[in-house]
Regions:
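Rossmann-like NAD(P)-binding element
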Residues: 56-89
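A short helix->loop->beta-strand "cap" motif at the edges of active sites that frequently abuts
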Residues: 92-96
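Conserved small/polar residues in nucleotide/adenosyl-binding loops
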Residues: 103-105
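NAD(P)+-binding Rossmann beta1-loop-alpha1 motif at the extreme N-terminus of oxidoreductases
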Residues: 1-47
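Glycine-rich, phosphate-binding/catalytic loops in enzymes
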Residues: 22, 88-91
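Short, functional N-terminal and low-complexity linear motifs
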Residues: 2-7, 51-52, 74-78
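N-terminal glycine-rich dinucleotide-binding loop that anchors FAD/FMN and/or NAD(P) in oxidoreductases
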Residues: 43-58
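Short His-Asn-centered micro-motif
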Residues: 99-100
Length: 105
């Protein structure tokens, strides 16, 4: 099963680590310094009782990642309209899209 998380902030990063820990083929769409850090060092999650780093596939360009079984959108709600065209390379008729977008006031 291939899962892509679009938005690798706090929520997307957390989900990415948890999915990778159980062996899911997970990729993340990110940008800037956070993207470069993930490519170089993996994705790190520090919790009360643990500190884990997992290797992940990450790209700024969704075309690099191919079709996904699930696309999880973890952007702030006001950003979602701007990514509609960008997610097209990730989805086909079998892809399930889940939006965990949050409203920030």
């Amino acid at each position: 099963m291939k899962i892509c998380i679009f938005g690798a902030g706090a929520i997307g990063g957390y989900m990415g680590v948890k999915l990778a820990q159980v062996g899911t083929d997970v990729s993340l769409v990110a940008r800037g310094p956070h993207l470069e850090a993930m490519k170089k060092n993996g994705l790190r999650l520090i919790e009360r009782e643990s500190d884990v780093t997992v290797p992940v596939t990450a790209s700024e360009n969704p075309k690099d990642l191919g079709f996904q079984d699930y696309l999880i959108i973890t952007l702030k709600a006001h950003s979602v309209p701007s990514i509609i065209e960008k997610v097209r390379p990730l989805v086909n008729e079998k892809t399930t899209i889940v939006s965990l977008s949050l409203i920030h006031i």
